[in-house]
């Protein structure tokens, strides 16, 4: 629902593409209103915090990293918990270290792949599933992050 809402706003030319802080704030607001469950709130936190960092003069990688830190703070997920954090954090670490978008995409893919080997999930919807169900399957949120970064390359 969130991606469709943003895509619809983009197609209707309702997004302030030339003003990244405003864009991120608007995306955060829209995600909070259309995405269900905790995912919408957490993605809203990420984009809103990133927008604030951009407004204060931060670079895009720094802003996204700040958004991730806020999301982790409020959501509680960390690397190794089998969530989108396992793919997003390594990708953003690569970008903040000055690596290329392709290298960030590789980091996201490796992070997503690592979730398929995790014995249990400590956060997110996957935490309700048993080991047999999780074995060999990437976390859906981590996989989504992997696909987003792959599409950007």
Question: Can you say where each PLM-predicted feature lies in the sequence?
Answer:
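N-terminal loops that bind phosphate or other acidic moieties
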Residues: 1-153
């Amino acid at each position: 629902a969130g991606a469709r809402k943003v895509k619809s706003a983009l197609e209707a030319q309702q997004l302030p593409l030339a003003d990244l802080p405003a864009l991120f704030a608007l995306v955060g607001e829209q995600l909070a209103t259309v995405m269900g469950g905790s995912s919408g709130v957490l993605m809203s936190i990420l984009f809103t915090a990133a927008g604030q960092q951009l407004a204060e003069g931060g670079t895009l990688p720094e802003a996204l990293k700040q958004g991730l830190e806020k999301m982790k703070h409020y959501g509680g997920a960390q690397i190794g918990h089998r969530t989108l954090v396992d793919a997003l954090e390594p990708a953003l670490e690569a970008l903040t270290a000055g690596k290329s978008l392709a290298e960030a995409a590789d980091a996201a893919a490796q992070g997503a792949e690592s979730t398929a080997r995790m014995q249990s999930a400590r956060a997110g919807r996957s935490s309700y599933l048993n080991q047999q169900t999780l074995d060999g399957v990437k976390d859906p949120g981590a996989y989504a992050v992997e696909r987003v970064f792959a599409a950007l390359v």
